Amino acid sequence: MSHSYNVRPLVSGAPHVSLVTASTSDASIDEFFSHHPIDEILSEKGALLFRGFSINEDQQFSQLVSILAKEELTYQERSTQRKKTAQGVYTSTEYPAAKTIANHSENAFQQVVPGKILFYAHQAALKGGETPIADNSRVLSLIDEEIVAEFRQKGIRYLRNFDGGFDLSWQEAFQTEKKREVETYCVKNAIDCEWLSDSHLRTSQLRSATRRHPLNRKEMWFNQLHLFHITNLELPVRQALLASLGHDLLPRHAVYGTGEEIPDEVVDHIRAALVKAELVFPWQTGDVLIADNILVSHGRKPFEGERAVRVALIDPVYPSAEENPHAQR
């Protein structure tokens, strides 16, 4: 039996997030995509919020992920702590409830990135906890052209120190206990790595600041420099780390691809563009959001009460040396 679906902009004037509802309670999300090819509709809409589709458990969400995915992805080369709750399903970033997570494209610092990201609101927060969505092409248009041009020319270099102290250990980040596996991964993914001790790994990777969408070919702001940059930390923490470690041993940092420091005011300008472009909407328990990870970015607002939002990554997008030269060393 075929069901009817209603697709409309979630908010007037913000076409990059559409709300999908169904006429009957037995309609399913996977049936919707049997009539609307996922790649085509996401490249047009950006993100789809499915509401009222009786997704109540992680296992149901996992089954949906496996149906929709051409290829599932695991969280390797991790940036944050997560727990696996079902096949292909993870907790959202485990970060203090009172803090904001700035909008970003998932794993944009990696060479191979998720083409799509799926969220499931297992339990919406009592207050706050929204997942804002921003159109990455609008973010790009809001950043001064001189700044964009410099990033196009120089790229971004992400620097990390894994020593099990302030940030993740290398074992957690790369999901292995074997140094050889880390080294193999780094070679395969254009990452320079250096062992400073048995427990201390330093990495450096050169990436582009923008990326063209594989289908519509639009250029998108696509990076995580504002999350890696030292100014993402609160001032007292930043000052303490710089005093004790210096720039070279910071847990994470981002500089121009040339090695030059990115001025704080440039990073602040980029953060302001991300905030200006975001669309904020409240979760309802059972909501499923399916987004094109290159077209749109996401974040998290502070919250009160219990909040459980799951996430899955699917359909890897591989770099093109011609279109994205900084994806190669």
Curated annotation (Swiss-Prot):
It comes from the Bacteria. InterPro entries: AlphaKG_dependent_hydroxylases (IPR050411), TauD-like_sf (IPR042098), TauD/TfdA-like (IPR003819). Its EC number is 1.-.-.-. Pathway: Antibiotic biosynthesis. It is an enzyme of class 1 (oxidoreductase). Its cofactor is Fe(2+). GO terms for biological process: antibiotic biosynthetic process. Keywords: Antibiotic biosynthesis, Oxidoreductase. One of its GO terms (molecular function) is oxidoreductase activity. Pfam families: TauD. Involved in dapdiamide antibiotics biosynthesis. Catalyzes the alpha-ketoglutarate-dependent epoxidation of the covalently bound N-beta-fumaramoyl-DAP-S-DdaD to generate N-beta-epoxysuccinamoyl-DAP in thioester linkage to DdaD. PANTHER family: GAMMA-BUTYROBETAINE HYDROXYLASE-RELATED, TAUD_TFDA-LIKE DOMAIN-CONTAINING PROTEIN. This is Dapdiamide synthesis protein DdaC. It comes from Enterobacter agglomerans (Erwinia herbicola). The gene is ddaC.
